[in-house]
Amino acid sequence: MLHLVRRLATLVSVPALMLGLVSTSVAAAAPTTGAPTKLNLPDGFQPEGIAIARGTAYFGSRADGDIFAVDLKTGAGKVISQGPGTGSLGMKVDRFGRLFVAGAAGGNGRVIDTRTGRVLASYTFTTSATTFVNDVILSKNAAWFTDSRQPVLYKLSLGRHGKLPAKPQTIPLSGDYQHTAGNNANGIALTPDGRGLIIVQSSTGFLFRVDPRTGVTKRIDIGAAVMTNGDGLLLIGRTLFVVQNLLNKVAVLTLNQSGTKGTLVREVTSPDFDVPTTAAAFGDRLYLPNARFTTPPTPTTAYWATAISATTKPIKHAVDEGECDRIRFLAPAQ
């Protein structure tokens, strides 16, 4: 199922638990043998984001913001939350079962109860027409959102027991990051040590480490590699997956603990990809929604998510904001 484009290393190992910003949420181990490798989504859905928790994948529609939940064991799914009419892009689930959703051109973010589909909170980050709230990552005490049209991050500070804030904060980006025309800050992840944030700038293909206290950015040294069309990011241990949407591939990098330097170790693709936008992990697989940006959307256009083999040996603990099992990468997926 998975075609290897380039193999630069055969062993990627996962270090000790991330510290600092990292969430303490843990997901139960879940074998995926026999589960479907293609998840069919509603016709015309136009997926963009994905989050996984407790064997369920949540997909957001960039068309109307609906949230569609899929049982990873069976592939059966249903809409659990009606959208606001604007897109639902990047998403993450916290340990309380709350889905944090980036609101695209709406300039907002929502928090949804995955059990009931009820919107628990909605935040207006900006009233500017020049906005595209693109992705979100959860740390221990905050949710962080990117805006591809504004040189800022939006922060929702979480209180005791995950209490949601009354209003968001805006953190201007400075340092090496230079805002350009087109899509800018897109995917976001934590650094391996949990002390910083990582963003990918789609227009340049650069990765940046962000100081969460100040917004000061420093370009991550990844040698001559460029993350062209970089979209969603997924960090597991010191392994960073960068989904390169229009290139139909995923770059796999090994980072140092502080997230200031990395090495491209391989690139992978699948014949089932059709502009994948981001990735979430469960068991021994990565799941990627296919946005099909190059296909004109109609009410009958087919959409799906692709599951690719990511690992050979899930191990006991879980990382990455409660969404995936802690994993040792023994060899490239075949």
Which residue ranges define each predicted feature?
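Hydrophobic alpha-helical segments and helix pairs
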Residues: V111-T170
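Conserved beta-strand positions in repeat-built beta-propeller and related beta-rich domains
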Residues: Y58-D64, V93-D94, L99-G106, W144-R149, ...
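Short loop/turn segments that connect beta-strands within beta-propeller blades
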Residues: D71-G75, D113-R118, S157-G162, D211-G215, ...
